[in-house]
Structure formats: structure tokens, C-alpha cells
Amino acid sequence: MALFSKTKAAISPPPTKAAAAGSSYNSNQGAAMVGQYYTYTEGVLFSQAMSVPTIARAQQLIASVIASMKLKMYTEMWNGEEMEQVPLAPRSWLRRIDRANTNNHILSWTVSDLMMFGRAFWYITERTADGYPASFTRLPAAMCTTRDQAGSPAGVWFAPSKEVYFNGGEINPKDLVQFLNGQPGIVYSAQKAIATSIKLEDARFRNASSAIPAGVLQVQAGSEPLSSTELADLAASFNAARATNQTAALSPEVHYIETATSPDKMLLVDSAEFQAMEMSRVCGVPAYLLNISVGSYAYTNSTEARQDLWTFGCKQIAECITQTLSANNVLPNGTCVEFDIDDFIDGDLMEQSDKMEMPQPPRNNGVPYSS
């Protein structure tokens, strides 16, 4: 007979107070700025990075996957052979992290902060009677600074900060949940690559908006020189004739020379493909998932593509979130949180495949079957 029940619940008691209401922190001016959304900003570095199409696509893929999955709670118990996960009833905030927002929204922007800045911040707005958090709100990472860890230019964070300033005001670190990514934020670690992509896109924009002639009329050497007005009139009359006739006529003194510029050269297609590949390396997402041409590549079905996206793009950030939320400052010791990834990896696909595999009607000696 088991000594412990596997139906143990971890339902949180009703919240009784806000996190900052009874704070004994000496300076907590930053808490007064929480929720003042008109002051919120994502910063210049974030805007520059998201202006690169490949980075924007990678962020959309990773954020859409993680933010669409449900969180579930469990504890671990020794069953005589190995540690076994025992499901627990979730605390109320797992279904509504921020009472004023959806889980999809707060998790999407948390993923963005972890990708771009290497860290993210949640402020605890309410606590339950046992002292554990009951509700959170996200603080934009671009507005949070840490005096004990500069972070830039490498974007490396060594541990949760004890001196956090939000929007210029110091905030009690005990009222914060600090998520630290295992990789540097790309706005710090890939500044040159991002700047190169932006300059390349600017060059393509200039070329796209500039009118390059399809050909040049060249007056031969030894001929009577023409003034600028005469040259302009000659080109205009030539264009008018070509617009209404299939055949053009030129005197021996004037030659028509086609320009060697092609649309792919004008739009720097090869350079753009290479830079997109570089950005896929920066984001850690396989290039084929970002619709980048990778030459000859083995066929990959939908299930394998999902597994690649989860393994190479999402797993580390998802683990950062769940391990942080499983810490003792968020949940009681021994209580853990994880994402339910079954539906994403193969759950719904298996259901679809079962529906598609319908029994075929019988065939007899080539005679068509009729119902």
C-alpha cells in the first residue's frame, strides 16, 4: 500500500495582499511605476533587431510555440525504482499569470525579452496567505537596469540581481521573479550582424526606389558633340518611339548599349540570402524553418519540423521559464512547473493521422465499388 497519495493538491489559498504593500525595502520607488503603461517601452535595440525579417520570423516561431502551451504542476516521488512524476492540482496563477492579461501575451513577451536581452522580469502583484505569489505582471527588460551587473556589451548575466531599477526607480528584488537565459541576448551578442542586416536592407531599399535605365544611347567618337538638351531630347524621342513601335531606328552616329544590371543584382539577392542565413544562426533556429533556401536538403515532414523547432529554438527558453517558476521563491520546495508539450510535438498530429486513415472500400476484379 502506498504511503503517499498521488492525488495531492497544491491549490493556492485566496490572495490576501499585494506584494509591495508590506514591503520593508528601504527604497521602492520603482514599484510605483509598475502598471504605468504609457511609460513602457521596448527600447531602440529591440526595435532595430525586430526590423530584421529573419529575427522577427524566428521570434514569432519561438514565442508562438511556448506561449500557446499550458503550464502544469507536479512533484517527484520515489516508486522503488526511479523518481516518478506525480501531477498536482495547479495553483490559480498557472491559468492566469497576470489578472489583467492573457497567458499568451505575457509569455510571448517574456520569450522576446529572453531572446533579445537574455533576461526577463515579472513583478509580484499579489501574494497568498502562505506568502507565495498569486499574480504577476511583466516588466519590460529594456526598462530594467541592474547596478550590480552591467551586462553590456556582452549581454551576460551571472545571477539574479540584488539592485534592480525599473524606469529609474529602485525596486525590491524580493518582489521580482528574474528569468536568466543561458545565452546572451542577441541585441548585445550580435550587434554587428544586426547592423549589417539593417544596412543591407537600406541598400536594397535605395536600389528598389532608384530608376536604372534598361539601356544607354551613346554618341560615337568623331561625331558632332551634342548638348545636354539635345541628349535629353534624343533619349525622350527614342523612348516615345519604342513605346509605340516594335522596331527602333538609329543613325550610325548613335549606338544603343544595354545595361548589365539585372533585378537580382539590383536587390542584392545573394547578399540578402547570406545575411538571412547568418541571422538564423544568431537566433538558433534551423534555416529551413525560416523559409531560407538551404540548397539540397533531405525531406522533413511536419512532425520532424516541430521537433527541430522545439529542440533547437524553444527548449532552452522554455526550460529557463519553467525552472525559474519552480524555484522556492515562487512555489513550495519540491513543487515543479513544466510546459505540456505533448500536443505540440505529436498529439494533435496523431489525431489527424488517425482521422485520415479511413478504411478503403472493397475492390473486386477491377469492378468499381458503388454504395
Regions found by a protein language model. Give the residues of each.
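Structured, contiguous alpha/beta core segments that scaffold functional sites
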Residues: 2-268, 272-274, 278, 353, ...
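Activation/maturation switch segments at domain boundaries
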Residues: 2-5, 11-13, 62, 297-316, ...
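Active-site-proximal structural scaffolding
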Residues: 115, 210, 230-231, 272, ...
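Short acidic alpha-helical/loop segments enriched in Asp/Glu that coordinate divalent cations
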Residues: 247-250, 287-298, 324-333
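Internal mixed-charge
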Residues: 275-276, 281-283, 321-322
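Helix N-cap / loop-to-helix initiation motif
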Residues: 284-287, 368-370
